[in-house]
Amino acid sequence: MNLLTYSLLSLSTLFTSTLALPTASQSTPLPPSQDPFYTAPANFSSSAPGTVLRFRIAPGNLTSIIPNCSIAYNIVYRTTNSLYLPSFAVTTLLVPSTPNSSALLSYQIPYNTASVDASPSYTLYTDGPGYPDIPAALGLGWLVNIPDFEGPLASFAAGVEEGHAVLDSIRAVLSLSKQIGFSPSVPYAMWGYSGGSIASEFAAELQVQYAPEMNFAGMAIGGLPVQSLDILTAASGGFFAGLVPSSLLGITAQYPDARNYLISRLKPSGPFNATGFLRAEHFSYADAQTYYENQTIWNYFLNGSSDVLDAPVIQKIIHRDCIMGYHGVPQMPMLVYQAVADELAPIVNTDELVNRYCGVGANILYQRNTIGGHLAEYTNGDEGALEWLEAVLGGTYEGKYKGEGCTVQNVAINVTSSPV
């Protein structure tokens, strides 16, 4: 361990050890852009990644919105952005109603937005009932960590930023074990679908180099957009069209030159103009889906899709920040599940990613569902993912699943009426 690493870890330990259990905060949650809590203190960059910077009981009534939750905390922590510069993020920790929390699940919500005010720590108050996996995990006695992994700039689809933020959220939560009252050696795992799989998968890749001290029990991910170009080319003109402006604004949020270029290529007038495109900066995923549905997003650009897909300044970001499989080999057991007919995230790219990982020793159960599409698989794959996570977090994985190497299964699971 070098002197710089030792100094950062010492500062981190000192800061966390002086944190007292917080009292109740304000009664009404504020949007992150209006809440002073969503800031980092001066000189925070000298602390180690994962250091807790602020800590509070979540405002409002999350415990009455989310079943099986006894208390909720908001945690601001130090992390690292896609440029490998110090940054910060916020996570929400839900504590189960049952005593003696037995495991920690980091649940990456696919919030898919270029607006910081649509981050989970705020939208859980309105959207929480739409995520039944959360009370299910709490009902099993698990702590549930829900990070705002896009960070303070809402860098949607920026995988490196998102992966760092997930890893550091778990570091932050584990450092508070004494204050909150759970074992620091609790087993922990990740779960994410679609946009949540981006953050989870990048965290798994980056863990080897960025957080080598961490030892995950496992990771379940589904609906993987292995390459951002998958979203950009597949979504425009259809149901998911809102993902295109949101992801382009998200991946350029940390790159001012790229953002300025993107804006410069938007049409100044007409039915598809810059004002309409930039509305996505303030839209939640649901708002963007409603506003842009069936629009050909390339109509907003002076020269159509070539202004984006052929632009070196955009391509550089995509290759640096938005393609899975190039930052390390995940070391934990993995469940990967995807619909063969996924219209948003082509399964051929997931096949290739899994094959690459399996070729270098990864432990993966890969389930290819022959029924349904992207939305349907969110539900179709859910029960199996939770069962798999119960095994890895409950210590029964080796007895139920293959502990080494890879298993590829073509399955036919249909528990939803969704046609896509």
Regions found by a protein language model. Give the residues of each.
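Cleavable N-terminal signal peptides of Sec/SRP-targeted secreted and luminal proteins
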Residues: 2-20
